[in-house]
Amino acid sequence: MVLSIDERASLSLMLLQNVLRSINNTKTYVEPRVVGGDSWVQSMANQESAKWEPDFGGGPNKVVKDAVLSAYEIDIEGIIVLPGDLGFLNPHDIDQMIDLSKNLTRAVIARATADGGTNAILMPNGMLIDPSFGPGSFERHLHLANIANIPMSICNAKGLEFDLDRPEDLLAYRQSRSDFDEVLNWWTDKLKSI
């Protein structure tokens, strides 16, 4: 399946909306923030009651580190880094991460099954693990936490295992959602109407 540029943008918004709605429906209050993206991403963040912040560049790992440090500076108790392409994420997955943190006394990480990357990481204030996202980052993050003596739990929630990085991921996601084409077309039409 090959998506047009408009369809790729639409898919990104579909997935981001799922992530933000999952955050907004957790049993524990989590303040959603979105870092970076275009005006559509900013609009989606606003629509889903998330705070939007600009991306000041330097690559994804620097952007994540800057966002985490910024949150720590304003005494946020902890931060969960979630990519916007978690199509199967649900509120229970996020609640499970929070529970595994044992009242924010340990960091929590979730593996991307397909490439060994990191699909989520919860870092309580004072437990910064230097971001090293990308293929194989799950093991890197575990190693960095170990070096820094940060206690770490692993979350195996199903909705955190799958992200859309490869064509076969898109096919699997499409097959799992009976409304995929309808929702994608709705978003594509909406983007074209502006």
What is each model feature region?
Residues 143-194:
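Conserved alpha/beta core of the MobA/IspD/sugar-nucleotide pyrophosphorylase nucleotidyltransferase superfamily
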Residues 77-85:
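Short beta-strand-to-loop acidic/aromatic patch adjacent to the donor-nucleotide binding site
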Residues 46-78:
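Short phosphate-binding loop-to-helix
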Residues 27-51:
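Acidic donor-binding segment of Leloir-type glycosyltransferases
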Residues 89-115:
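Conserved donor-nucleotide/metal-binding helix-loop-beta segment in metal-dependent transferases, i.e.
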Residues 1-10:
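Glycine-rich N-terminal loop/short-helix segment of MobA-like nucleotidyltransferase
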Residues 10-29:
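A short, N-terminal amphipathic alpha-helix
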Residues 124-145:
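Short, glycine-/small-residue-rich phosphate/pyrophosphate-handling segment
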